[in-house]
Amino acid sequence: MRERDTVETSLSTVIVVVGGPDELVQAARRAATDIPGARIETCDLRNAATMVAKYWPFAIVMSEDVYAFDPQEFEALARDVAALLYKTNTDGATAHSMEEAMRPALLEAVYARFE
């Protein structure tokens, strides 16, 4: 098990979606249906660090636009909790197309977390 800098009781099957839009949240919810016990927590940009520290997600999902706000901080945040940082272009994308692209990455991340 990894050492942790943040107080946490157990590894979780949480995915934190930062900033939406709604289609991205829907895509993450549907992609997570293949992962037993997975649940989605959403947050806005200003409380992303708090939510990640609270839940220790195996994946952090956001749009490329949100990521562009502070790439170095998001990379560090994901690294601190050993989470996948999944970024996607949401401009013109459908929830279905984002779900299909996201599903394999989430499955790989959850398997890596619990190896």
Tell what function each PLM region has.
Residues 63-64:
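Active-site residues of response regulator receiver
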Residues 68-70:
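Hydrophobic residue at a beta-alpha junction
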Residues 43-58:
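Acidic, metal-coordinating helix/loop segments flanking the phosphotransfer/catalytic sites
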Residues 51-52, 72, 94-99:
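Short, charged, surface-exposed secondary-structure boundary motifs
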Residues 33-41:
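A generic structural motif
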Residues 1-14, 19-30, 94-115:
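Non-catalytic signal-transmission and effector/linker regions of two-component phosphorelay proteins
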